[in-house]
Amino acid sequence: RISFDGKHLQSLTPDKGNHEIAFSPSKKYFLDTYSLVNVPPVTKLRRSSDGQEIAVLEKADLSIYKQVGVSPPEVFVAKGRDGLTDIWGIVSKPSDYDPQKKYPVLENIYAGPHDSFVPKSFVPYSEMQSLAELGFIVVMIDGMGTANRSKDFHDVCWKNIADAGFEDRILWIKALSKKYPYVDIERVGLYGTSAGGQNTLSALLFHPEFYKAGVAACGCHDNRVD
């Protein structure tokens, strides 16, 4: 909350997470549901005037995940092409993974400039985890050129959609393999739909030394028809 003069900034949702709120009819109270990609949802009742927590109403139960050995995605951060900028992404691995083995990597790519695409909230069912169960390390990355960061970060894609943040993505995956030897840097593929399909084809055409295979679905391969 903030005053019309730009002063007195006050957070009414202090818990770390991505928040969704719903006000009561009187607007005196609101429900605050928050989560992270690796933290399940919590719902609290708060007072609108100051954000005071009144009650914890619900916490998601992850016991069934633990029973089958599935873990939420891991958040991983590495430096981008400039050596300074943090590049964020997530990693899913098989529930029965063996750290002594090597696993091929699949990148779920979508580098459209109109948003950021790595999920910020908890996802109870994950396509990435389903693919990981087939024996892959599956990753999703927001490289330079995606939105919701600084203007300089976003402007990388200006009149340069083909960039797609590949320099950052490749560095990120290489950093992941340095931390986790079970990540096989010699077997990296990717897949995507729409802009992600275009990105997949671009990866194979312009970065074949790194990306060895790809599946492009409904790719917008000629931006002149957009």
Q: Which residue stretches match the model-derived regions?
A:
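Beta-propeller blade signature
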Residues: 2-5, 45-47
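Serine-hydrolase catalytic core recognition
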Residues: 11-13, 20-226
